From Swiss-Prot:
PANTHER family named among the record's database cross-references: LARGE RIBOSOMAL SUBUNIT PROTEIN EL15, RIBOSOMAL PROTEIN L15
Family annotation (Pfam families): Ribosomal_L15e (PF00827)
Name of the protein: Large ribosomal subunit protein eL15
UniProt record similarity statement: Belongs to the eukaryotic ribosomal protein eL15 family.
Stored InterPro entries: Rbsml_eL15_core_dom_sf (IPR024794), Ribosomal_eL15 (IPR000439), Ribosomal_eL15_CS (IPR020925), Ribosomal_uL23/eL15/eS24_sf (IPR012678)
Length: 204
């Protein structure tokens, strides 16, 4: 096994003494920093490389923290309108996971970069910490690399805002197999339209 494989096996046992101590120290370190900052190198190089990171110019790592827990509905003075069924304010759960939210916040802040992927690094009682892999689409080292220059195309701008990253896809219900029949046609909305629309076929 290579060195990265050993690191990968280490992270599979997060309750081990080694990793509990390491994550505890790292959480303390991340709490002292701003909520979004650039990391000099990935904290988990094995995971970053599996998700597309390369230690070359044009690839950047941003570390971000997201507050854990559900989402409170932003209602002015508690005025909720409509039926009592939709009066909830506190116990609402967001559709997207916190990793997707973290990617979105990095993507909005770093508008000129492309978000490639992200991964979990640590968490404590209040926050979850993620590292987001970003790519500079205008860097020659990226544009000349045939394995990654697909991300330079304009169609891949803000992938994270459209649910095209791995974390974003998880809440869209997109996949293959018998459990993903509700999104046949591209999305839940496309599947619903196809099933609920009246089709008047012209037979010739």
């Amino acid at each position: 096994m290579g060195a990265y494989r050993y690191v990968q096996e280490l992270y599979r046992k997060k309750q081990s003494d080694v990793l509990r101590y390491l994550l505890r120290v790292r959480c303390w370190q991340y709490r002292q920093l701003t909520k979004l900052h650039r990391a000099p190198r990935p904290s988990r190089p094995d995971k970053a490389r599996r998700l597309g990171y390369k230690a070359k110019q044009g690839f950047l790592i941003y570390r971000i923290r997201v507050r854990r827990g559900g989402r409170k509905r932003p209602v002015h003075k508690g005025c909720t309108y409509g039926k009592p069924k939709s009066h909830g304010v506190n116990q609402l759960k967001p559709y997207r996971n916190l990793q997707s939210v973290a990617e979105e916040r990095v993507g909005r802040r770093m508008g000129g970069l492309r978000v490639l992927n992200s991964y979990w690094v640590a968490q404590d009682a209040a926050f979850k910490y993620y590292e987001v892999i970003c790519v500079d689409p205008f860097h020659n080292a990226v544009r000349r690399d045939p394995k990654v220059n697909w991300v330079c195309n304009a169609v891949h701008k803000h992938r994270e805002l459209r649910g095209l990253t791995s974390a974003g896809k998880s809440s869209r219900g997109v996949g293959k197999g018998y459990r993903y029949s509700q999104t046949i046609g591209g999305s839940r909305r496309a599947a619903w339209r196809r099933k609920n629309r009246l089709h008047l076929r012209r037979y010739r």
